C-alpha cells in the first residue's frame, strides 16, 4: 500500500501599530471629552516558528512564538476613602507599559483505526508585564487627584508632579491560564453514530494585578508584586450524535454535557493585598455542569 507523508516548516513575523483602547484615549472617558496627551499607538512585534507533520494515521503541529507589546495602554479603577471617610471610586489611565508573551504549542490527531480518533494539545506560555507605567489618578468627576485621599489638583502649571509611577517588571499577566492541555477521543462504532469524550486542564492562571490606592504615592514608584496564582483545575466533557433518515428527511440528534463531574473551580480573580485566596476580590467561578440537546433536520 502506498503511504503518503508531508513535512512542512514555517516562519512568520509581523508588526502592528494600533490605536490605544477607548478608555485610554481620554483623560476620563466616563465624564469628559478631554483627550489624553500621553496616549500613544500600541506597537506589537510578533515572531512565530512552526513545524508540521502529516501522514495517513498521524498529524501534528508544533509552534513557538514570541510577542512584544510596547506602549501598552492600561486602565485601572478602584476605591479610596476620602477626607470625610466616605468610599469613592478612582480611575487611572496609564501609558508606557510593556508586555512580553512567549511560549510553545503542540497539537496532534491520531487515527489508529477507521472508527477511532485521538486528539490532543499542550500549550505552555510565559506572559509577563514589564516596564514602567505612568498615569494620573482621577475622581468620578474627571478631576486629577493630588493624593489618594481625593484632594483635587487646582494648579495645573506643573501637573506632571501628580503622576503615579507603576513598576511592573516580571509581573505575570492575569486572566488566562498559561499552561493548558487537552486530550480527546472520538468513536464511531456504527454508521451514523459518534461518541466523544474530552479532558481539559488549566494551570498557572494568575489573578489580575491590583493597585492599592492607599499605598500609592507620587513620591516613589508603586511596585506591583507577583499576583495570586489561582489553583489549577480540569474538566471532562462528553458528547454524542446520531444521524439517521426519517422518511425523506435527514436528521441528526446530538447532545453534550460540559463539566461532567461538576468540578468547582475559579476562572478569574483580582489580586488582593496579601496575594492569596483570602484577600482576592472579584472572584469568578467557572460554569458547573451544563448540557445541551439538539435536533437538526435537513430537507
Task: Give the location of each predicted region.
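Short, small-residue-biased leader/transition segments that mark boundaries at the very start
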Residues: 2-7
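Conserved C-terminal beta-signal and adjacent last beta-strands/turns
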Residues: 8, 42-47, 117, 170-299
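Transmembrane beta-strands of outer-membrane beta-barrel pores
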Residues: 13-19, 55-57, 66-70, 102, ...
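Outer-membrane beta-barrel signature, preferentially recognizing the C-terminal barrel domain
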Residues: 15-69, 80-111, 173-179, 229-231, ...
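Solvent-exposed loop segments that connect transmembrane elements
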Residues: 23-35, 74-92, 130-169, 208-226, ...
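Gram-negative outer-membrane beta-barrel transporters
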Residues: 66-68, 87-212, 296-298
Amino acid at each position: 500500500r502506498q503511504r503518503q507523508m508531508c513535512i512542512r516548516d514555517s516562519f512568520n513575523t509581523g508588526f502592528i501599530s494600533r490605536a490605544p483602547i477607548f478608555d485610554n484615549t481620554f483623560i476620563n472617558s466616563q465624564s469628559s471629552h478631554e483627550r489624553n496627551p500621553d496616549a500613544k499607538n500600541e506597537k506589537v512585534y510578533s515572531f512565530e516558528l512552526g513545524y508540521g507533520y502529516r501522514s495517513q494515521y498521524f498529524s501534528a503541529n508544533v509552534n513557538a512564538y514570541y510577542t512584544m507589546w510596547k506602549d501598552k495602554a492600561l486602565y485601572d479603577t478602584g476605591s479610596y476613602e476620602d477626607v470625610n471617610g466616605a468610599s469613592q471610586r478612582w480611575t487611572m489611565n496609564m501609558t508606557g507599559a510593556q508586555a512580553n508573551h512567549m511560549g510553545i504549542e503542540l497539537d496532534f490527531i491520531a487515527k489508529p483505526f477507521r472508527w477511532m480518533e485521538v486528539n490532543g494539545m499542550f500549550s505552555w506560555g510565559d506572559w509577563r508585564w514589564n516596564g514602567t507605567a505612568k498615569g494620573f489618578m482621577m475622581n468620578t468627576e474627571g478631576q486629577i487627584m493630588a493624593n489618594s485621599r481625593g484632594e483635587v489638583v487646582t494648579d495645573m502649571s506643573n501637573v506632571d508632579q501628580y503622576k503615579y509611577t507603576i513598576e511592573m517588571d516580571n509581573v505575570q499577566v492575569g486572566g488566562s491560564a498559561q499552561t493548558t492541555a487537552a486530550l480527546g477521543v472520538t468513536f464511531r462504532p456504527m454508521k451514523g453514530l459518534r461518541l466523544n469524550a474530552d479532558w481539559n486542564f488549566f494551570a498557572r492562571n494568575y489573578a489580575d494585578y491590583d493597585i492599592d490606592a492607599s499605598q500609592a504615592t507620587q513620591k516613589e514608584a508603586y511596585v506591583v508584586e507577583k499576583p495570586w496564582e489561582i489553583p489549577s483545575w480540569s474538566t471532562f466533557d462528553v458528547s454524542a450524535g446520531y444521524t439517521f433518515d426519517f422518511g425523506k428527511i435527514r436528521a441528526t440528534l446530538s447532545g453534550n454535557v460540559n463539566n461532567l463531574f461538576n468540578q468547582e473551580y475559579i476562572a478569574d480573580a483580582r489580586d488582593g493585598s496579601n496575594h492569596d485566596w483570602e484577600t482576592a476580590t472579584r472572584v469568578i467561578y467557572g460554569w458547573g455542569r451544563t448540557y445541551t440537546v439538539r435536533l437538526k433536520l435537513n430537507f
